[in-house]
Structures are given as C-alpha cells and as structure tokens.
Amino acid sequence: MTLDAVMKELAAKGSESIKRTYLRHGAPEPLFGVKIGDLKPIQKKLKGQQDIALDLYATKNSDAMYLAGLVADGAKMTRKQLEQWASGATWHLPAGCVVPWVASEHPEGFDIASKWIDSPKPLVAVAGWATLAAIVTITPDDGLPIKQVSTLIDRCVKEIKSAPNRVKYTMNNFIICCGTYVAPLADKAMEAAKKIGAVEVDMGDTDCQVPLAESYIIKSRRGAPVAPKRKTTRC
C-alpha cells in the first residue's frame, strides 16, 4: 500500500465520536478518530513495511502515528529516527505509547531514554520515562542495568511531585513497572511507591485517574513475587 492509500483508508474508518474523545484527551488536529481495533487489519497489510511506518508518523496525524508504532520495527530504526519520533510527538499518546514501543526495541534504547528524561521538553521526557518502563517490562532482569534502574527509582521518589504534569504520570508508571516486573528491585520499587503515595496529574476533561502505584503493583503481581515479563508493550 502507498501512504496515500493508507491515509484514505484511515479517513474512511474515522468516527466523529471517537475523534471527539481523542480531542478531549488532548489530541491535536489532524486526526480522523479511528478505533484501535480498526487499525489492526491495516497493520497486518503493512507488516514489514518500515518505510511506510516512518512516513505515517511524519504526517503528524494521530491515527497515522499510532499505526506507525504498530508497524515499525524499533530495532531497525536509527538513533536519529528515534530522536525525530520523540521530538515529533504531538501529544502524550504518541510520546507515552508509540515512541516507547519502538525505542524499547532498539539496542541502545536504555541509553537513549536515559537522555530523554533530562529533556526540558515535557513530551520528550514523557517518552523517556515511558521507554524505560517498557524496557524493564520486556527485558529479562539479567539484561537490565540494575544499578542504573535502582538509581532511577530513587530519582522518581525525589523528583516526581515537582515534575511537569504528564511526566509525573509516566514516572509513576515506571515505578509500577519496576515493582511488577523487576525481581531484584521489586521490594525497593514497592517502598518507593509507598513513599510517593498519590500522584496528582491534571487529566483534563476526562474521567481518567492516576493509578496508586502501591496497590497497582500488588494487583499486577497477581499473588506472585513479580509478574512474568511481557513480550511487547504494544496494544
């Protein structure tokens, strides 16, 4: 499929009600309002078409950007391309979901994300923390830089309450993922969650809430010391 053909199919699947929901959650124009489930058949058609994925993200259309993240292979992206995706995120969904999907697959993902979290641009920092959360979720513990992850947990405890709005949300999620999936740091992450407590984030005109890290970790472990690693964070 060509980029033009994909965009036409996305437009045809758009819904005004879904679009209004996305706009209420912070999405900027342009977008069509395509249900996530309706993107999956298109994703199958585009499997392996890396160039189309890159072109889709570059459109700045929220539906196309989400589809790009479903199609792209992060391991095949260059560091420059990942930087472009992070800096090009138009709102918290591509920054907190799409970019982390691909960045977490890259062999230098941890190093890249560790730099993003220091960015003065909130959406880039969101991409950084969300990528780190994705990495600890899918990477075997023996493949993680445990000391660095431990230091990041300490940083969250110290800085989360003063961080920018959506950055707080992703830092909280990083703590949740460490407590849920990283056995060597599970207890430390739980203690961090207790210290942090409730995190206040302005979620706009939505009913969305920030999960309480301590209770969410317990729920996610399902009675086990930690939950099994996930194969991917894409959804």
What are these regions (language model features)?
Residues M1-C235:
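Alpha-helical scaffold domains
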